[in-house]
Amino acid sequence: MLAGLAGVALIMAWRAALEDTLYIPRLDRVAAPILDGDAPDAAWRLAKPIIVPTGFGGNLGGKGNSAVEIRAVHDGKWVYFRFTWEDPTRSLKHLPLVKREDGWHVLHDRYDRADERAFFEDKFAALITNLPIVIPGDHTYRGGPTPIADKPGTLSQRGLHLTSAPGVAMEVWQWKASSGGLRGRIDKNHFDRPADPTRAQTAGEVLYRGGYIPDSRATSLYGDNFEAQPVGGYERPIPPKRLPTDWKATYAALGKVDLEPDQGDSEGSRWWMTMAESEPYSSDRDARIPVGAVIPGSLILAEDPAQRADIKGAARWGVGKWTLEVARRLDAEYPDVPIGSNTRMWVAVFDHAQTYHTRHIRPVRLELQR
């Protein structure tokens, strides 16, 4: 009997050493938080935060690390998270286009290799699963330039995401500042078994994603303001898909324009265009825009990017930190992940980087009050 109790205690101590627990109180007499990226809601005062140190990322003032504070509450139908992470700059410049004498050029640094680290929006991601994983390792990722023996290598040379078996539910939320994120949009992606590559992917001409499955609705809600190019293709002039109806108003909406990647963007600036603010490219309209003009590289294709979503959020940056508030339904069907006690979470910070994100080993185990 004593030996059995000692064994249970040892297992519990071992698990506690390998994971953090986020206690999520139930809202009974307090209203659910308003999703606005601001902190004063009474609901958040009920939630005890945990701090998750993340590292091995890109930029972030040259440090490559960011501490992420997580709080959460639930009301029996929805769970509400508040993520606050360190980021010295508000980065909204997402692959902007600048007009030169020979035409329009996409500002980038390795975007053709899926490894943009300069002209990219800030992002944040959270992975959730109900698998009892305490060290993600081979369950979600293979590293190196050729991570999977019978599949193409990665253009970035830094590995692929996947699942270790078919039918495993792994859901990845991704908030993207200029691709609908500041309008309430959060992508809901998934990891699965590695997909079969296309001929172009096998030849190393275009990106191979392994088992990463992007949100199927994303392409109808936002996109780049230029056609995708193969490796090396962004070094030549590329016409925008759309030009601003009023280029001066669009330029003014960018705020103070500083094309130094490590310089943050001003509050209220918008580095994206909507359909209502733009028209399909034409040489006549192009001729009215002077050399030196800068236009957004991100297009918002839908009036409300967060429409009919079962996950939504709002974010705000200030004093070197982003705060993102997220609401997600608790129930879900495969391939989504129902959220409950023992759901595990990992988070990642992207500072104006496409794929070069921070990471951490110990999962956050969720524990919901009944």
PLM region spans:
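Short, well-ordered beta-strand segments enriched in hydrophobic/aromatic residues
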Residues: 37, 78-85, 322-328
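Acidic, glycine-rich flexible loop segments
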Residues: 296-335
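Hydrophobic membrane-insertion alpha-helices, especially the h-region
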Residues: 1-13
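N-terminal onset of structured domains
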Residues: 64-72, 77-79, 90, 333, ...
